[in-house]
Amino acid sequence: MSRRNQAVGAYGERCALQHLITAGMRPVERNWRCPHGEIDIIAWDGPVLAICEVKTRRTDTFGAPAAAVTGPKARRLRVLAAQWLAETGTRADEVRFDVLSVRVTAAGPPRIEHLKGAF
């Protein structure tokens, strides 16, 4: 991944995090990594633990950002969430998997779409 794409992705994650905070969610972890992958943001939405995948795009050339979350990616996030819960000892009666699509353009602020329970 190019440095520019990394910078755009990092910017998108910061925007998504601020969006979640503004919406009243409480982030508990950001960019949690293990040998099997990474979870972008983990946050409480009231009593629900939200595992959030952030996808950022500058254009729609390759489709909507959320379209990049494929079946294998969703399965991997489920495994990662179970691992995070086990490692941290966190208890959650409900775990939800969200996708935040961030569209960054040169004109205007980024557009953020938060798909709760995306998969």
UniProtKB/Swiss-Prot annotation:
Pfam families membership: UPF0102 (PF02021)
Cysteine pairs bridged by disulfides in the record: none
InterPro entries associated with the record: Restrct_endonuc-II-like, tRNA_endonuc-like_dom_sf, UPF0102_YraN-like
Gene3D superfamilies documented for this protein: 3.40.1350.10
Transmembrane intervals: none
CDD domains, A to Z: PoNe_Nuclease (cd20736)
Single GO MF descriptor: nucleic acid binding
This protein's name: UPF0102 protein Sare_1228
